[in-house]
A protein has these predicted regions:
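Active-site pocket-lining/capping segments in soluble small-molecule metabolic enzymes
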Residues: 1-122
Length: 122
Protein backbone atom coordinates (compact mmCIF):
# COMPACT_ATOMS: atom_id res chain seq x y z
CA UNK A 1 0.00 0.00 0.00
CA UNK A 2 2.92 2.32 0.67
CA UNK A 3 3.98 2.14 -2.98
CA UNK A 4 0.62 3.37 -4.32
CA UNK A 5 0.99 6.76 -5.95
CA UNK A 6 -1.72 9.44 -5.67
CA UNK A 7 -3.18 7.96 -2.49
CA UNK A 8 -5.45 10.99 -2.23
CA UNK A 9 -7.26 9.71 -5.35
CA UNK A 10 -7.82 6.19 -3.97
CA UNK A 11 -10.99 5.06 -2.26
CA UNK A 12 -10.65 2.27 0.28
CA UNK A 13 -13.73 0.12 0.87
CA UNK A 14 -13.89 -0.39 4.62
CA UNK A 15 -16.66 -2.91 5.13
CA UNK A 16 -16.72 -5.08 2.01
CA UNK A 17 -18.97 -8.08 2.44
CA UNK A 18 -17.66 -9.76 -0.68
CA UNK A 19 -14.85 -12.17 0.14
CA UNK A 20 -11.29 -11.03 -0.55
CA UNK A 21 -10.20 -11.81 -4.10
CA UNK A 22 -13.77 -12.76 -5.08
CA UNK A 23 -13.73 -13.61 -8.77
CA UNK A 24 -17.26 -12.21 -9.19
CA UNK A 25 -16.83 -8.95 -7.29
CA UNK A 26 -17.19 -6.73 -10.36
CA UNK A 27 -20.35 -8.58 -11.36
CA UNK A 28 -21.72 -8.22 -7.82
CA UNK A 29 -21.25 -4.44 -7.92
CA UNK A 30 -22.77 -4.24 -11.42
CA UNK A 31 -25.86 -6.09 -10.21
CA UNK A 32 -26.17 -3.91 -7.11
CA UNK A 33 -25.90 -0.76 -9.23
CA UNK A 34 -28.48 -2.04 -11.69
CA UNK A 35 -30.87 -2.87 -8.83
CA UNK A 36 -30.44 0.64 -7.45
CA UNK A 37 -31.00 2.31 -10.82
CA UNK A 38 -34.06 0.22 -11.63
CA UNK A 39 -35.31 0.07 -8.02
CA UNK A 40 -35.73 -3.68 -8.42
CA UNK A 41 -34.04 -6.01 -5.92
CA UNK A 42 -35.39 -9.02 -7.83
CA UNK A 43 -32.55 -8.54 -10.32
CA UNK A 44 -30.19 -10.01 -7.70
CA UNK A 45 -32.05 -13.33 -7.56
CA UNK A 46 -29.94 -16.21 -8.76
CA UNK A 47 -26.85 -14.12 -9.47
CA UNK A 48 -25.86 -12.59 -6.20
CA UNK A 49 -23.16 -14.15 -4.05
CA UNK A 50 -24.53 -16.37 -1.27
CA UNK A 51 -21.87 -15.04 1.08
CA UNK A 52 -22.99 -11.46 0.49
CA UNK A 53 -26.53 -12.45 1.46
CA UNK A 54 -25.22 -11.99 5.01
CA UNK A 55 -24.73 -8.31 4.23
CA UNK A 56 -24.08 -6.81 7.67
CA UNK A 57 -21.33 -5.33 9.77
CA UNK A 58 -20.61 -8.54 11.70
CA UNK A 59 -20.00 -10.46 8.46
CA UNK A 60 -17.77 -7.71 7.11
CA UNK A 61 -15.75 -7.61 10.34
CA UNK A 62 -14.75 -11.25 9.86
CA UNK A 63 -13.09 -10.53 6.50
CA UNK A 64 -9.35 -9.97 6.33
CA UNK A 65 -9.94 -6.93 4.12
CA UNK A 66 -12.07 -5.21 6.79
CA UNK A 67 -10.85 -1.73 7.76
CA UNK A 68 -11.87 -0.55 11.23
CA UNK A 69 -11.99 3.07 12.43
CA UNK A 70 -8.79 2.34 14.39
CA UNK A 71 -7.13 1.04 11.20
CA UNK A 72 -8.17 4.22 9.39
CA UNK A 73 -6.70 6.48 12.07
CA UNK A 74 -3.56 4.53 12.92
CA UNK A 75 -2.58 3.11 9.53
CA UNK A 76 -4.29 4.53 6.46
CA UNK A 77 -4.49 8.25 7.27
CA UNK A 78 -0.77 8.40 8.22
CA UNK A 79 0.04 6.64 4.92
CA UNK A 80 -1.78 9.39 3.01
CA UNK A 81 -5.13 7.75 2.23
CA UNK A 82 -8.01 10.16 2.74
CA UNK A 83 -11.05 8.60 1.03
CA UNK A 84 -12.93 5.76 2.66
CA UNK A 85 -16.12 4.18 1.38
CA UNK A 86 -18.80 2.27 3.29
CA UNK A 87 -20.95 -0.44 1.73
CA UNK A 88 -24.61 -0.32 2.57
CA UNK A 89 -26.86 -0.07 -0.48
CA UNK A 90 -28.06 -3.65 -0.14
CA UNK A 91 -28.26 -3.74 3.65
CA UNK A 92 -31.42 -3.71 5.68
CA UNK A 93 -31.91 -0.19 7.09
CA UNK A 94 -31.17 -1.20 10.68
CA UNK A 95 -27.98 -2.98 9.60
CA UNK A 96 -26.83 0.15 7.78
CA UNK A 97 -27.55 2.21 10.89
CA UNK A 98 -25.11 -0.05 12.75
CA UNK A 99 -22.45 0.59 10.09
CA UNK A 100 -22.93 4.34 10.38
CA UNK A 101 -22.80 4.19 14.17
CA UNK A 102 -19.66 2.06 14.11
CA UNK A 103 -17.75 4.36 11.78
CA UNK A 104 -19.11 7.83 12.46
CA UNK A 105 -20.37 8.16 16.04
CA UNK A 106 -18.35 8.36 19.25
CA UNK A 107 -19.00 5.46 21.62
CA UNK A 108 -20.75 7.53 24.29
CA UNK A 109 -23.34 8.84 21.80
CA UNK A 110 -24.16 5.54 20.07
CA UNK A 111 -27.11 4.43 22.28
CA UNK A 112 -28.86 7.80 21.95
CA UNK A 113 -28.28 8.07 18.18
CA UNK A 114 -29.28 4.41 17.66
CA UNK A 115 -32.63 4.97 19.43
CA UNK A 116 -33.27 8.14 17.45
CA UNK A 117 -32.47 6.56 14.06
CA UNK A 118 -34.49 3.43 14.83
CA UNK A 119 -37.53 5.60 15.53
CA UNK A 120 -37.13 7.30 12.17
CA UNK A 121 -36.72 4.01 10.29
CA UNK A 122 -39.72 2.38 11.97
Amino acid sequence: MQSIENKEKCELLCNAVCQPRCSKRLRHYEIISQCQLENDDALMNGEYCAFAANDNLQTAMMQKNFISPDDINSTYLPMGFKNFKLEGRTMAPLDFIEVLLYYLIKEEYKPMIRRYLQQIVW
